[in-house]
Amino acid sequence: MSRHAERYPTKNAGARHLSLLNRIRDANVVLNGSLSFLNNWTYFTDEPWKDFDQLTRTGPYAGTLQAFMTGVRFLTRYEHLLQPGRRTRIWASDSQRVIDTAAYFASGFFGLDWEKTDKAVLEVIPETFDRHADTLTPGDTCLRYIEDADNGHDNGYTMLARFQNKYIPDIAARLTLKEQNEEIGPLTNLEVWSMQEMCGFETLVRGSSPWCSVFTQKEWESFAYARDVIHYYRAGPGNPYAGAMGWLWLNATTALLHAGPEAGTTFFSLSVTLTVMQLPVIPWTPKSTI
């Protein structure tokens, strides 16, 4: 069971990035201090709306390369599990970056000719409500999880915003007031959050990013914890629906184990949701006040 490989920002996150960068550009001022690199910096894709949501294709951390190399590593470890003459099914949710991840993985594991030689077949599972309780994307088909504003999917964003408000205002003040960048105007929590996001996304594409040097170690620790918060309350132990959705995967795995070797020796499932995949979890609470 795996998510997709490394990707560009989603359209929602990318839109935030571009909006921030356009606002700073429109201010038409020379930036100082930590943000001075923006005077000569360009976004990490020339075709953002084409690349958003898709696998990264360049740099040492390219998603296409990562998926292929994962297939190669699996082959070196688990080739003995392959059954000669038996076609392996690879399940992928209906998202292009997931489908591409599965295809690159298959090329690394089964060889570049995996489709022509019928060594494996890629089965794409739609992310639609008529699929009901499938094991790949239950978060997209559980209505109560989607519609429950207090305890469902959106609770992760609520708790994230609460924690962002504890650590981001000080960063915004440092970048504007202390570093003499007042002319760009106040930075919102989401704008600073977008800056922190761009460190990782640019690193995936270019191998490094000047955004990473903008923030202190403590500020990065807060960002990492904030990422834990959103997943904890959106799809982890802090969400009352997580166990039910994770049970689908657990039940399917249990059924395969009971069936024994006759059911097959290799099973590959790749998924995409806006969260981490819902798996059975042990209760745990982030050690901080939100």
Language-model features: locations:
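Signature for phosphate-centric chemistry
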Residues: 1-87, 93-268, 274-290
